[in-house]
């Protein structure tokens, strides 16, 4: 969790990555061959989280289609002991740098700066999120935390028997949604 021990929250690694997605989106949208009124973002896991962050920070994006978005609801993931997979770094951080959890509240406050659920209400794009309810890499509760805070048009495709894996038929749903931009 690079930047977590820096006193300046602006130095959090993922803050910089979020801003890189903005630069990329705006660069692409400024190209002559791109219709800036028909731009979408798509990604899964970390790419899903970054896609939602980008959609929140670039309101011109029309569609955000993601599956099992990572980078959300760190504190709840910690409290429910779901720190496997994508969130394992939380456990590693505390074991290595704060084994007695004397700074736990400070750590989760700082992680709030890079928690996509806190950006979700800024999203203007139409959103679709694919969730596998058996996902033990990015807990569904973290994904619902983001989804529930999105105020724009949204829908969720729920796969009860799927983990953090390809969601059968989800790509077709995404393509149908993206077809709206053609």
Please provide the spans of the model-predicted regions.
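Short beta-strand/loop motif that positions the catalytic acidic residue
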Residues: 123, 129-131, 135
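Histidine-bearing beta->alpha loop at or near hydrolase active sites
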Residues: 153-175
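Short alpha-helix in the alpha/beta-hydrolase fold that links the catalytic acid
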Residues: 125, 139-148
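Acidic catalytic loop of the alpha/beta-hydrolase fold
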Residues: 133-138, 164-165
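Cap/lid segment of the alpha/beta-hydrolase catalytic domain
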Residues: 1-19
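Alpha/beta-hydrolase fold nucleophile elbow
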Residues: 33-45
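Hydrolase active-site cap/lid region
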Residues: 53-101, 158, 166-169
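Short glycine-enriched nucleophile-adjacent loop
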Residues: 29, 42, 48-59, 64, ...
């Amino acid at each position: 969790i690079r930047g977590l021990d820096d006193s300046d929250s602006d130095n959090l690694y993922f803050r910089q990555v979020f801003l890189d997605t903005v630069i990329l989106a705006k660069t692409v949208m400024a190209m002559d061959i791109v219709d800036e009124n028909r731009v979408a973002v798509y990604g899964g896991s970390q790419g899903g989280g970054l896609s939602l962050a980008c959609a929140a920070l670039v309101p011109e994006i029309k569609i955000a289609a993601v599956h099992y978005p990572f980078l959300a609801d760190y504190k709840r993931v910690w409290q429910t002991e779901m720190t496997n997979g994508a969130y394992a770094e939380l456990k590693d951080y505390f074991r290595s740098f704060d084994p007695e959890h004397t700074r736990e509240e400070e750590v989760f406050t700082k992680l709030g700066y890079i928690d996509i659920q806190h950006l979700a209400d800024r999203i203007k794009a139409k959103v679709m999120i694919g969730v596998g309810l058996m996902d033990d890499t990015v807990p569904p509760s973290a994904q619902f935390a983001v989804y529930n805070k999105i105020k724009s048009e949204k829908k969720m495709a729920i796969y009860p028997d799927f983990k953090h894996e390809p969601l059968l038929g989800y790509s077709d749903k995404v393509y149908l949604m993206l077809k709206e931009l053609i």
